[in-house]
Amino acid sequence: MSAQKPGLHPRNRHHSRYDLATLCQVNPELRQFLTLTPAGEQSVDFANPLAVKALNKALLAHFYAVANWDIPDGFLCPPVPGRADYIHHLADLLAEATGSIPANASILDIGVGANCIYPLIGVHEYGWRFTGSETSSQALSSAQAIISANPGLNRAIRLRRQKESGAIFNGIIHKNEQYDATLCNPPFHDSAAAARAGSERKRRNLGLNKDDVLNFGGQQQELWCEGGEVAFIKKMIEESKGFAKQVMWFTSLVSRGENLPPLYRALTDVGAVKVVKKEMAQGQKQSRFIAWTFMNDEQRRRFVNRQR
């Protein structure tokens, strides 16, 4: 297993502080959500879900050419810089086979969400093609609306409904399909109560009372599942063995470092040939993803070159 030291990825477009004047020009509705910090600096009211949504609209339009983006109330509104970091580190992982980032990689996003965030960034930054899976018909409808509202995305992103309860890859990866990588931001809580407690902690950290709005939205399938993150990723690992020749790299975010040991044991049990951990950091937030493959170095080189 190899690891990388944390830090915002060099190719991430969000190293600098937000240029709020420019972002307000891109999306004028953002202006109403600007606040002043105790130091007298302009900022965004991150505790307000409407403010975070307005900021995301501006960021996606300004940096990623997504002119039309929206999500229904109650769905996760993702922090764009952190999502971009996953995409850039994934690009580096794909580049290790041949020394260059593949321009026409095919990526499977497990749980694409109503926001469709990973495909939007990946298509713009690297020209990749995406398949996004979802269990929620409402989330799929939202993601499809985003795709249809922005020219060119229909050719780059396709969506599939996961109809099989508890399945992850089964029913989504079709016979004879090949993917350079899968990615996933798994539900991390193990119950609805734990998800609510997590939201309450964030509320307290922001100094909010129980009546204040909160930007940490999320539907059940986005926030929790039976057994939590470890159980979900273990299921993913178990199913991945059946697609060992169709997918070069399987990857997933892991929210807590203490969840890694049981996942490493599961990867040993299924016979993963190589396992990689990539550490990431966005401000005070530390995150990571693990990646595993059933292909050796030569097999991965051949896989990458199959359509080149």
From Swiss-Prot:
Subcellular location: Cytoplasm
GO biological process: rRNA base methylation
Top-rank taxon, per record: Bacteria
GO cellular component: cytoplasm
GO MF, any single term: 23S rRNA (adenine(1618)-N(6))-methyltransferase activity
Catalytic activity line of the entry: adenosine(1618) in 23S rRNA + S-adenosyl-L-methionine = N(6)-methyladenosine(1618) in 23S rRNA + S-adenosyl-L-homocysteine + H(+)
UniProt keyword terms in alphabetical order: Cytoplasm, Methyltransferase, rRNA processing, S-adenosyl-L-methionine, Transferase
Keyword Lipoprotein: no
Protein EC: 2.1.1.181
Keyword match rRNA processing: yes
Main location: cytoplasm
Family listed: Belongs to the methyltransferase superfamily. METTL16/RlmF family.
Job of this protein: Specifically methylates the adenine in position 1618 of 23S rRNA.
Name under which the protein is recorded: Ribosomal RNA large subunit methyltransferase F
